[in-house]
């Protein structure tokens, strides 16, 4: 069972606070604000097919200070390994002038929504550069 309230401080640029069905990513620094803005922008401008691979963005606070998303159940390391072995992660199609894959295939970057759909919960990799 998923706890109603959790705080995840493992991220180097953001802290994630989960409460009920929501997840709030709070920026620790300028890079965290850039990552929040990147995810909000990508969610807003991408295609429906790509959006189905991404955890939904509900709101972005000014300057990227915070990003409100739908909460997803984190993947376990075992589930992640199974998805890698089965080549079951969704395919992100390259569309110029995009930056390429916005996520990595690691457990901490993926989760499942309440409907069971596999989504990237951290898709700001290009903003880290």
Identify the function of each model-found stretch.
Residues 13, 51-58, 104-108:
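Short small/polar-residue motifs
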Residues 100-129:
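Catalytic activation segment of kinase domains across protein kinase-like and atypical kinase folds
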Residues 2-48, 62-67:
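ATP-binding glycine-rich loop module of kinase domains
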Residues 28, 45-90:
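Conserved structural core of kinase catalytic domains
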Residues 93-100:
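Protein kinase catalytic-loop region centered on the HRD/HxD motif
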Residues 34, 80-82, 124-129:
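Active-site Asp-x-Gly
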């Amino acid at each position: 069972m998923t706890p109603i309230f959790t705080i995840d401080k493992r991220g180097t640029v953001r802290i994630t606070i989960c409460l009920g069905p929501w997840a709030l990513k709070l920026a620790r620094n300028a890079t965290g604000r850039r990552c929040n803005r990147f995810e909000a922008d990508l969610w807003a401008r991408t295609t429906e097919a790509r959006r189905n691979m991404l955890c939904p963005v509900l709101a972005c606070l000014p300057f990227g200070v915070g990003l409100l998303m739908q909460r997803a159940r984190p993947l376990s390391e075992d589930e992640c390994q199974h998805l890698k072995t089965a080549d079951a992660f969704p395919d992100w199609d390259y569309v110029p002038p995009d930056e390429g894959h916005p996520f990595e295939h690691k457990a901490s970057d993926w989760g499942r929504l309440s409907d069971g759909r596999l989504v990237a919960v951290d898709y700001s990799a290009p903003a880290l550069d």
